[in-house]
């Protein structure tokens, strides 16, 4: 466990300014929140620890899932600013729609390098300001109100303040440092695993298409029995907009473990654990690449091209909101009076072991995502979006899809802008006002 020293009284840091809204995290959720709030007239700063915007969408993955309901007669359930993102990718000739064989609906596969530019362009054009290479160190809170952040930058420690905050860090870093309540992955239900993704080049796509996913999994099992170190035997690969290049989701590493005292710790508790996971993930990916070249049709002359910038993290902390979305909400495709987004993705639980648990929603249906699940229970001026929003383990395993993260971002950005303008808490605003504002952005609120 790491303990953070508070700065001494009287010690001052360089101040970077005061904003209406600070969004901590510029991933799919945070970037859309910043864009939505800035378009609504707020003075916005969005901050990220990486050197580019997009978070997992640009550092780890290359496909948006969640735009459609499940089934053959799919309905589009995410729109507005997320459509602007897809249009930006299409402008580069850098996206394809790809059917998904795992029940998550049609996916939008893209070139992550172009997506970085798209995200940053949309943020800039919205009027929001972006700060990269900035790591959150400390949060100042008084009576449930976040006041100021301390950031570690290449220029040293700096402070920045705002009237309203959105935690879009993925790991709930803002809420954690603020002392707000959350459930840590693994405390109640088994935590989802980590994945280092990788790409292969010089792939013969026509040959690769001759075997389906079931045969690929059989080949993985056969290779494991022959001595290949493949801990996950249900991994996947797919074509990309880049010719003769495939992307993979194959590796698997545990995100929690017991320390020397027998206490459960995650990759957020021990920096050496996260470091070891990054190193092990790349080593594991290299073994999967060897398997592909040796055993899978179409890969005979291919080469490993690149690893994800970061190891992919599915679940760490889930903040307690005014409402927690639960498993039964998802499976019943429950609708809420205050829903601000929709999700039709299955519960996709990448637990420890060699398999993945899938539980599907009824065809053509979607669960509503209530505004209350985005309002931090312990704060009067903070919302939480993305994969650290308020949900149980199972519900989170469905709603963490990137299209839903974008939809949550729009909802939080619009709600925050109204709260700032009206000088009210989000929970005090008439929902009809938020719903009307969301509809104007093109957001889809009903199936």
Model-inferred region functions:
Residues 56-57, 116, 152-153, 157-164, ...:
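Flavin (FAD/FMN)-binding glycine-rich loop and adjacent Rossmann-like elements that form
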Residues 4-18:
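A short, basic/flexible loop-to-alpha-helix module at the beginning of a structural domain
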Residues 30:
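N-terminal Rossmann-fold NAD(P) dinucleotide-binding loop
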Residues 143-149:
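Short, hydrophobic/aromatic-rich segments at coil-to-beta transitions
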Residues 15-27:
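Beta1/beta-strand and adjacent pyrophosphate-binding region of the FAD-binding site
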Residues 2-7, 36, 42-43, 48-138, ...:
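Conserved N-terminal/central alpha/beta ligand/cofactor-binding core
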């Amino acid at each position: 466990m790491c303990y953070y020293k508070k700065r001494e009284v009287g010690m001052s840091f360089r101040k970077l300014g005061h904003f209406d809204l600070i969004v901590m995290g510029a991933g799919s959720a945070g970037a859309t929140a910043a864009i939505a709030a800035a378009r609504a007239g707020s003075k916005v700063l969005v901050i990220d620890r990486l050197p580019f915007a997009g978070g997992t969408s640009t550092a780890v993955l290359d496909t948006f899932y969640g735009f459609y309901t499940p089934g053959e007669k799919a309905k589009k359930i995410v729109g507005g600013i997320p459509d602007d993102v897809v249009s930006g990718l299409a402008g580069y000739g850098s996206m394809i729609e790809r059917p998904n064989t795992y029940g998550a609906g049609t996916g939008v596969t893209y070139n992550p390098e172009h997506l970085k530019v798209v995200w940053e362009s949309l943020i800039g054009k919205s009027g929001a300001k972006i700060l990269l290479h900035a790591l959150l160190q400390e949060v100042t809170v008084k009576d449930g109100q976040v006041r100021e952040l301390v950031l570690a930058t290449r220029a040293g420690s700096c402070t920045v303040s705002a009237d309203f905050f959105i935690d879009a860090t993925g790991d709930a870093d803002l809420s954690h440092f603020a002392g707000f309540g959350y459930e840590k992955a693994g405390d109640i239900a088994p935590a989802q695993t980590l994945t280092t993704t990788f790409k292969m080049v010089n792939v013969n796509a026509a040959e690769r298409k001759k075997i389906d996913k079931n045969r690929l999994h059989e080949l993985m099992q056969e290779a494991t029995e022959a001595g290949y170190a493949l801990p996950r035997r249900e991994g996947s690969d797919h074509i990309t907009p880049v010719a003769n290049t495939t992307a993979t989701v194959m590796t698997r590493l545990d995100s929690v473990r017991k320390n020397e005292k027998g206490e459960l710790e995650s990759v957020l508790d021990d920096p050496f654990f996260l470091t070891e996971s990054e190193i092990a993930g790349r080593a594991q990916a290299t073994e999967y690449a060897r398997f592909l070249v040796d055993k899978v049709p179409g890969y005979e002359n291919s080469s490993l091209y690149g690893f994800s910038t970061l190891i992919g993290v599915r679940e760490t902390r889930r903040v307690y909101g005014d409402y927690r979305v639960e498993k039964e909400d998802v499976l019943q495709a429950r609708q809420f009076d205050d829903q601000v987004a929709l999700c039709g993705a299955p519960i996709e639980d990448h637990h420890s072991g060699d398999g993945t648990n899938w539980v599907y929603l009824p065809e053509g249906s979607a669960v509503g995502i209530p505004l209350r699940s985005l309002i931090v229970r312990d704060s009067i001026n903070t919302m939480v979006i993305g994969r650290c929003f308020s949900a149980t383990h199972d519900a989170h395993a469905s709603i963490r899809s990137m299209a839903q993260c974008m939809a949550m971002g729009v909802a939080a950005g619009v709600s925050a802008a109204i709260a700032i303008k009206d000088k009210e808490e989000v929970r005090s605003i008439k929902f009809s006002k938020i719903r009307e504002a969301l509809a104007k952005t093109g957001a889809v609120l009903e199936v």
